[in-house]
Design a protein with these regions (language model features):
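Acidic-basic catalytic patches of nuclease active cores, encompassing PD-(D/E)XK
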Residues: 1-30
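Mg2+/Mn2+-dependent nuclease catalytic core
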Residues: 57-81, 85
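Domain-level recognition of nuclease-like catalytic cores that cleave nucleotide substrates
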Residues: 86-117
């Protein structure tokens, strides 16, 4: 597997570790349906978050969060609604984006993480 192909799973694992440190319990990772995919579904006492993880080597071209366009948001919403129809929850649903900047070779160091709630 190419190093580039390993970055996505590495970024999602880094985002999950970040959420755990913030007190979230990971409910699902890479939740896939015919409607789309949600990278991480996590919960704390108040919220059930549907989290899109965006990993980039730098923000030179654009901020990672800018790649969550309206089409992607629609797919996330539809997938989250399907999840909620199959998993009853009293928690308030919320959509978050976790932006990770990881220059080449960063897998051995701490990435820069920004969490947009």
């Amino acid at each position: 597997m190419r190093a580039r192909d390993l970055l996505g799973p590495w970024g999602e694992a880094a985002a999950a570790a970040y959420l755990r440190k913030k007190g979230f319990r990971i409910e699902a990772m890479n939740y896939r349906t015919r409607l789309g995919e949600i990278d991480i579904i996590a919960a704390d006492r108040r919220y059930l978050i549907f989290c899109e993880v965006k990993l980039r080597k730098s923000a030179d071209f654009a901020a990672a969060r800018e790649f969550v366009d309206s089409r992607k948001q629609q797919r996330l919403r539809a997938t989250a609604l399907l999840y909620l129809s199959q998993h009853e929850s009293e928690l308030q649903p919320r959509f978050d984006v976790i932006e990770i900047y990881a220059p080449a070779g960063t897998q051995t160091r701490r990435p820069q993480i920004t969490h947009m709630e």
